[in-house]
From Swiss-Prot:
InterPro entries: Ribosomal_uS10, Ribosomal_uS10_CS, Ribosomal_uS10_dom, Ribosomal_uS10_dom_sf. Gene3D superfamilies: Ribosomal protein S10 domain. Coiled coil: none annotated. PANTHER family: 30S RIBOSOMAL PROTEIN S10 FAMILY MEMBER (PTHR11700). Belongs to the universal ribosomal protein uS10 family. It comes from Halalkalibacterium halodurans (strain ATCC BAA-125 / DSM 18197 / FERM 7344 / JCM 9153 / C-125) (Bacillus halodurans). The keyword Ribonucleoprotein applies. Part of the 30S ribosomal subunit. PROSITE patterns: RIBOSOMAL_S10. This is Small ribosomal subunit protein uS10. Involved in the binding of tRNA to the ribosomes. GO terms for cellular component: ribonucleoprotein complex; ribosome. GO terms for molecular function: structural constituent of ribosome; tRNA binding.
Length: 102
């Protein structure tokens, strides 16, 4: 018999909100009787944007901004119907992107 697995990938700009959301998901899945692996921290994407400070000249004067995207991975092995139902009803904060694969 093949094992069923739900893979949840979480993305957010703020790592504190991301860790709270991951902890809620793990707690909900364990409470409903499923085996949970994670949260596994994935590499953080860092995007750097360089812009000119001045509008017209002074090309040597530049400013850099960066945007970090933090990611976590959670695997739920052999989920019960109660697990899926509890995860559907779970209320997570805005700012967290959730990608679910069955």
């Amino acid at each position: 018999m093949a094992k069923q697995k739900i893979r949840i990938r979480l993305k957010a700009y703020d790592h504190r909100v991301l860790d709270q959301s991951a902890e809620k998901i793990v707690e909900t899945a364990k409470r409903s009787g499923a085996n949970v692996s994670g949260p596994i921290p994935l590499p953080t994407e860092k995007s750097v944007y360089t812009i000119l400070r001045a509008v017209h000249k002074y090309k040597d004067s530049r400013e850099q901004f960066e945007m970090r995207t933090h990611k976590r991975l959670i695997d739920i092995v052999n989920p019960t119907p109660q697990t899926v139902d509890a995860l559907m009803r779970l209320d997570l904060p805005s700012g967290v992107d959730i990608e679910i694969k069955l």
